[in-house]
């Protein structure tokens, strides 16, 4: 549960003439729990981040938010939430989502807007966002605040000219976490504000290289290993099957077995530990994390070219944690990204990697909460 001492900070904010305290709520739901930002409706620069609370099913999430609602009432019973947004993993249909980064039967991870406490998630003033949709709105918010560029480094500058992270036309925003997310940001003179299009393109099936490619044999064996685990060896895996927190342990299992003959139980392999071992130079882990990123760049290439993007943004916390490794293998990533059947399509396509921590999902949910709050009745 969240600390009431943090919630008390909202009493420092401006109230309305009738004494009401107008606020906005941004919430980001991850695989292990949720983060919440409460901000002043009158000034979005005045906010309190409540940190992390554990939740791995619908009941736990609703209990945490109901407890938060009671704590806000206890601190100031005249508060009114004018806009709320909550970021979730999984397709959203008719105000309902089955969260894909939680374990268990669909019934225990199905969430509707009606399930949420209505005082902090009011009807008609609350919205679900796909997690990468929220991240993309966070990129827009960071650009508006002039804090976007400082958190990214442009890769492959010998292949593309310098330019803004958020392109003037189309930008693909990608992130590897418990899954692989992708969203499109479109800026056009036809619209006053940038448009975000959430996608499920992390679930596109992998495009394998052919027989004459130098990496064909090893790549084919790795893809088959992943297919054996998920699809009885019959179907081509999706990019998320390797470019995710569940995919990295499978890659490590493959390379460790190839080197030692030992088949480690995949449930005993922790993705974070594999990444740390790779940073320390352990060969099996280096091979696994490198493959993890090679396929990530292949997914980025497919997404950015298919959507005619000028910029491709690799974002969120894992990208920051693995930044030294990314920079170390940059030449191999560059070769992968620009190796394409239509090389002229790659001209000028910029790639950015996040290098410092900034919670784009919280920024994005807060951005949308204020957009809802300021929307005319």
UniProtKB/Swiss-Prot annotation:
Keyword set, alphabetical order: ATP-binding, Glycolysis, Kinase, Nucleotide-binding, Transferase
Superkingdom, natural source: Eukaryota
Keyword Nuclease: no
Gene expressing this chain: GK2
Reactions catalysed, as given in the entry: D-glucose + ATP = D-glucose 6-phosphate + ADP + H(+)
GO terms assigned for molecular function: ATP binding; D-glucose binding; glucokinase activity
Stated family: Belongs to the bacterial glucokinase family.
Gene3D superfamilies: 3.30.420.40, 3.40.367.20
Keyword Cytoplasm (UniProt): no
E.C. number: 2.7.1.2
Protein residues bound to ATP: 27-32
Protein name: Probable glucokinase 2
Organism per entry: Trichomonas vaginalis
Pfam family name, one: Glucokinase
InterPro entries associated with the record: ATPase_NBD (IPR043129), Glucokinase (IPR003836)
Gene Ontology terms: biological process: glycolytic process
